[in-house]
């Protein structure tokens, strides 16, 4: 028996459209997962049989094993002490350089154009930009782009490229065949992101290239 405590109103609410989230939720529930939405763990204590988790809704759950999948937050404490410019993360330019000469940042802690991208693809491009700049070559420069994300959910294949700034647009269902869905995120009629599930994930790379 598995209880999954979810802070939002649906799974991966920050990057995934509700339509695909709901299909994934159905698949997980069919597998015996109990989903608890709009709830957040505030306290965890050891018990004789494992752990007791208490939520902000006043609920308590007993568990033998606890797995935290709550994301990451850049640790900028050291950078602040060193007078490096920070915001959400450590601020970098197109060469991955900070405001201090010869001090660089890449990876989960780096912020470019107000965005922290804690994914493998942008980190790989940051490494190329940093290496290029170090060797005096300016051909490789880091640019914040939408990233392609593959979720590791065996019950439902999902690939998506969420918009960088999801504030003025909306998710629209583009195609629906059985359990497979394709949604586009549009802003003033222009596609700036997509989400695919089921059989449609095979077209992810093609759509991603078109998006860029």
Kindly give the residue locations of the regions a language model identified.
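Mid-to-C-terminal Rossmann-like scaffold of FAD/NAD(P)H-dependent oxidoreductases
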Residues: 109-203
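Feature captures the FAD/FMN-dependent oxidoreductase FAD-binding
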Residues: 43-49
């Amino acid at each position: 028996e598995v209880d999954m405590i979810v802070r939002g109103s649906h799974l991966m609410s920050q990057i995934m459209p509700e339509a695909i989230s709901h299909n994934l939720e159905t698949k997980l529930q069919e597998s015996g997962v109990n989903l608890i939405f709009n709830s957040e763990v505030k306290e965890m204590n050891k018990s004789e049989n494992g752990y007791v988790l208490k939520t902000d809704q006043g609920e308590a759950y007993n568990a033998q094993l606890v797995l935290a999948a709550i994301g990451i937050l850049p640790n900028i404490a050291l950078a602040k002490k060193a007078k490096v410019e920070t915001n959400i993360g450590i601020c970098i330019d197109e060469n991955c350089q900070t405001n201090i000469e010869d001090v660089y940042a890449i990876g989960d802690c780096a912020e470019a154009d107000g965005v922290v991208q804690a994914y493998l693809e942008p980190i790989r491009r940051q490494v190329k930009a940093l290496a290029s700049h170090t060797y005096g070559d300016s051909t490789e420069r880091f640019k914040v782009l939408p990233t392609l994300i593959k979720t590791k959910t065996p019950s439902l294949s999902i690939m998506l490229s969420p918009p960088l700034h999801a504030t003025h647009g909306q998710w629209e269902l583009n195609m629906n065949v059985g359990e497979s869905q394709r949604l586009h995120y549009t802003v003033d009629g222009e596609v700036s992101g997509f989400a695919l599930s089921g059989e449609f994930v095979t077209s992810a790379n093609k759509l991603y290239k078109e998006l860029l």
